[in-house]
């Protein structure tokens, strides 16, 4: 059993039907004052369907879900916009994108920015490329490569949902960040030591991060218990 905002209780016997993701997503976004155009909601729901479909073929996300994909993965990704506004012409890198998270949901609601999704696993990138094509997204591309291969490219923002330690993500991201760029991570658990280590190692990475912010999101929904948005700044 899990809870949605406003303490709506859902059990396995009352799990959302396929026609309900629109209402669930719209309700959650309204709770957070996140205004989405109807066509954005349509694409986000369609992405959720595609993600589940591809996940049955290859391992993109856990197959033992305790909450609908539209909440646990897609809405979770959208919460980044509570702490960062994507600007026109902004270049964004999704580091270790897996099944397109958080990059594809963010690209859907921020068409003014351009997104590059990278992952070292070819079959995951193939899935992302197929989903991007199906969704007809023109501001996002997916490439099969390791982050070390992105020589000479710079980004205003790097986002990541992968489980690597913050210190490691900062080491990967620093050479790719614009001089006023930031790294935004979706993380969970106790992060005090992880953040401390990244700050202590900053001199190895040209002073990055100069500071780190931690934003708990457990008040949004119990589904996100112990989940945080972590932002590392130049």
Swiss-Prot record:
Binding site residues for S-adenosyl-L-methionine? 96, 101, 119-121, 147-148, 161
Task: Keywords in alphabetical order, please.
Answer: Cytoplasm, Methyltransferase, rRNA processing, S-adenosyl-L-methionine, Transferase
A cellular component term from Gene Ontology for this protein is: cytosol
- The record's EC number reads 2.1.1.-
Primary localization class, coarse? cytoplasm
Does this UniProt record's set of keywords contain DNA repair?
no
The UniProt function text for this chain reads: Specifically methylates the N7 position of a guanine in 16S rRNA.
**Family matches, as HAMAP family:** 16SrRNA_methyltr_G
Q: What's the name of the protein?
A: Ribosomal RNA small subunit methyltransferase G
What gene is this protein translated from?
rsmG
């Amino acid at each position: 059993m899990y809870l949605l905002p406003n303490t709506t209780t859902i059990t396995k016997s009352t799990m959302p039907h396929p026609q309900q993701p629109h209402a669930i997503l719209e309700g959650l976004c309204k709770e957070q004052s996140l205004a989405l155009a109807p066509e954005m909601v349509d694409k986000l729901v369609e992405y959720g369907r595609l993600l589940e479909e591809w996940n049955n073929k290859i391992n993109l996300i856990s197959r033992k879900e305790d909450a609908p994909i539209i909440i646990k993965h897609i809405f979770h990704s959208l919460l980044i916009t509570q702490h960062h506004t994507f600007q026109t012409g902004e270049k964004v890198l999704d580091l270790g994108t897996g099944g397109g998270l958080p990059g594809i949901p963010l690209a859907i609601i921020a068409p003014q920015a351009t997104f590059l999704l990278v992952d070292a696993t070819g079959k995951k990138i193939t899935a992302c490329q197929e989903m991007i094509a199906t969704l007809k997204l023109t501001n996002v591309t997916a490439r099969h490569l390791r982050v070390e291969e992105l020589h000479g490219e710079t980004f205003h923002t790097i986002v990541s949902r992968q489980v690597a330690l913050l210190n490691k993500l900062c080491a990967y991201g620093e050479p790719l960040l614009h001089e006023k760029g930031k790294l935004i991570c979706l993380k969970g658990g106790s992060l005090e030591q992880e953040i401390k280590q990244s700050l202590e190692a900053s001199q190895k990475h040209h002073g990055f991060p100069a500071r780190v912010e931690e934003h708990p999101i457990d008040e949004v929904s119990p589904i996100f218990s112990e989940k945080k948005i972590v932002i590392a700044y130049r």
